[in-house]
Amino acid sequence: MAVPTLSETLTTLLHRVLQGEDLTPEEGVFLLQQWDPEALTVIRQTSDRLRQQQVGDTVTYVVNRNINFTNICEQHCSFCAFRRDEDQPGAYWLGFDEILAKTGEAVERGATEICMQGGLHPGAKLQGHSLAYYLKLVETIKTTFPTLHLHAFSPQEVQFIAREDGLSYAQVITALRDAGVNSMPGTAAEVLVDEVRRVICPEKINTATWLEIISTAHALGVPTTSTMLSGQIETPQQQIEHLFLLRSLQQKAIQQDYPARFTEFILLPYVGQSAPKPLRKRVGRDQPVLQDALLLTAVARIFLGNWIVNHQPSWVKLGLAGATEALIWGCNDLGGTLMEEHITSMAGAQGGTCRSVENLQQAIASLNRPYRERTTLYGYL
């Protein structure tokens, strides 16, 4: 019997995908190892067709503002150029009035969402309690803007509050939800492989804790996004391991009939220009390699698309041109206007920190695809 050529294996695999089958992890790794231009073309075409089957041609965007309320942080992640010690030059901590003013400006500019995250500042307490401080952040925004969608606090921040105050994750998430947090960013995931985390973010929560906090949020009715920090030291096998964990967690939320689940997947390629030197040296470049990011984007659509239908590139990381190209590699959303974003821009990203609605619309229209403004949870506006 003739051994099938790589292209026959690839063709058969992609045909099965288009029939609605899920890839095995081994098949996902196989796709990430394809570098022949012809193979890349068929992988791209398959991801684009799947996107069309799963969510249609309309490309969505959200009008939002990022508020990074402090960069004072007790941790020292090897990819982070944002963090500062309290007494370091460049350290900042926004007051409640400043946060309210930024929110008001955003609403005037049509924002429907505030995305709020910050460093892990041990001094951020009210009456000696971390949770009280975070609830005051929520209350500051929600009292004045009760209908604004608040997308706030990563699993790492939830763990930090729980640790500081001796609470369970469920207690923290329930309190934040009841105060007005509408959804949580699935950041701090980086790569969900502890071997990688021990190098790039040894002080961060481990994989099991990230998964537990996200699953708890879903069970308590708080939707989350999912993310992956790619293109630093992780291997294709580890990238797929990460995607497999996300897929399994989404399947669990559906099987257990949890009231919430992942709303989207966002790929975040590593930007090292101003990041700490040791990881920069190890990675050996300062800006993402677009082709690597596009292949992983396509494979993420193929691997996750049956379970997480909305896929978004990061224009902050890739630039708007790179993110627009990702829309033909399996993505169906262009993300938010952001209005400001400190974490990636301080690492040296060249994508900018603010995009007008017109910028995003023009980028989408350049592909002859229709566009629609959406809510955080992917309802059309």
UniProtKB/Swiss-Prot annotation:
Highest rank taxon of the organism: Bacteria
Keyword terms, alphabetized: 4Fe-4S, Iron, Iron-sulfur, Metal-binding, S-adenosyl-L-methionine, Transferase
Cofactor binding remark: Binds 1 [4Fe-4S] cluster. The cluster is coordinated with 3 cysteines and an exchangeable S-adenosyl-L-methionine.
Catalytic activity: 5-amino-6-(D-ribitylamino)uracil + L-tyrosine + S-adenosyl-L-methionine = 5-amino-5-(4-hydroxybenzyl)-6-(D-ribitylimino)-5,6-dihydrouracil + 2-iminoacetate + 5'-deoxyadenosine + L-methionine + H(+)
Cofactor(s) named in the record: [4Fe-4S] cluster
Disulfide bonds: none
SUPFAM superfamilies: Radical SAM enzymes (SSF102114)
Domain Radical SAM core: 59-306
EC number: 2.5.1.147
UniProt-listed PROSITE patterns: RADICAL_SAM
Pathway: Cofactor biosynthesis; coenzyme F0 biosynthesis
GO MF terms, alphabetically ordered: 4 iron, 4 sulfur cluster binding; 5-amino-6-(D-ribitylamino)uracil--L-tyrosine 4-hydroxyphenyl transferase activity; 7,8-didemethyl-8-hydroxy-5-deazariboflavin synthase activity; iron ion binding
UniProt function note: Catalyzes the radical-mediated synthesis of 5-amino-5-(4-hydroxybenzyl)-6-(D-ribitylimino)-5,6-dihydrouracil from 5-amino-6-(D-ribitylamino)uracil and L-tyrosine.
Similarity remark: Belongs to the radical SAM superfamily. CofH family.
Subunit record text: Consists of two subunits, CofG and CofH.
HAMAP family recorded: FO_synth_sub2
Name of the protein: 5-amino-6-(D-ribitylamino)uracil--L-tyrosine 4-hydroxyphenyl transferase
The species this protein was found in: Cyanothece sp. (strain PCC 7425 / ATCC 29141)
Gene: cofH
